[in-house]
């Protein structure tokens, strides 16, 4: 029986999620305006750090999912970066991408790098390209050549700006819709692996 706290600490189907009984594990949080815009109030970063979390991956900006594809900044990115840094945590940043071309991916990379300039960003700057029905990118999901090229363009631009790049992608898309050899041999991968066979107890 696996519980939620075990998800990072197991080996399944040949994929190393982590090692059993690992003592060097580093816990982190993924935050965006969704965490701030709720009824629970302001994030207490001191409490987060005291709970053992060592790093924060902060959503800094994105591109709208509509046809216009406008760039936007996360309304709480500065507050979240400053709060995490003040609590002594390491900070990384990510861009919610809706790029449909290499040129747009480069634009997104420069946009986020401009926003985080001046902050001590020691964790990766991440390309978080996503799609689903109704998104401007919905017809590009299986376009492996373009998705790979956009990922490379974003990462190379981020690297040229002095940051460590990373690619966020779910397991299925990683195995089916990008060139894994080109990406994994050159860039770090933040692999999202969503479990969907929960019992009511929260165990599987």
PLM segments and residue spans:
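N-terminal carbohydrate-binding/catalytic regions of secreted carbohydrate-active enzymes
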Residues: 10-92
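Structural recognition of the beta-strand scaffold that forms the well-ordered cores
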Residues: 26-30, 54-60, 90-95, 123-129, ...
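Surface-exposed substrate-engagement region within the catalytic domains
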Residues: 115-125, 129-204
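Solvent-exposed loop/turn segments at secondary-structure junctions
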Residues: 33-38, 55, 61-66, 97-102, ...
């Amino acid at each position: 029986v696996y519980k939620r706290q075990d998800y990072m600490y197991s080996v399944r189907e040949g994929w190393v999620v982590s090692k059993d009984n690992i003592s060097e594990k580093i816990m982190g949080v993924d935050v965006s305006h969704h965490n701030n815009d709720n009824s629970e109030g302001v994030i207490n970063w001191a409490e987060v750090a005291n709970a053992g979390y060592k790093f924060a991956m902060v959503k800094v900006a994105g591109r709208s999912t509509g046809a216009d594809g406008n760039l936007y900044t996360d309304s709480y990115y500065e507050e979240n970066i400053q709060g995490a840094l003040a609590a002594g945590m390491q900070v990384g940043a990510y861009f919610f991408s809706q790029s449909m071309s290499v040129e747009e991916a480069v634009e997104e990379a420069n946009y986020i790098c401009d926003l985080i300039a001046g902050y001590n960003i020691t964790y990766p700057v991440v390309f978080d390209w996503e799609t689903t029905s109704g998104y401007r990118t919905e017809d590009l999901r299986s376009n492996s050549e373009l998705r790979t090229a956009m990922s490379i363009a974003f990462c190379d631009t981020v690297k040229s700006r002095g940051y460590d790049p990373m690619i966020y992608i779910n397991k299925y898309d990683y195995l089916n819709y990008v060139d894994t050899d080109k990406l994994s041999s050159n860039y770090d991968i933040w692999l999202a692996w969503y479990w969907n066979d929960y019992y009511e107890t929260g165990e599987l």
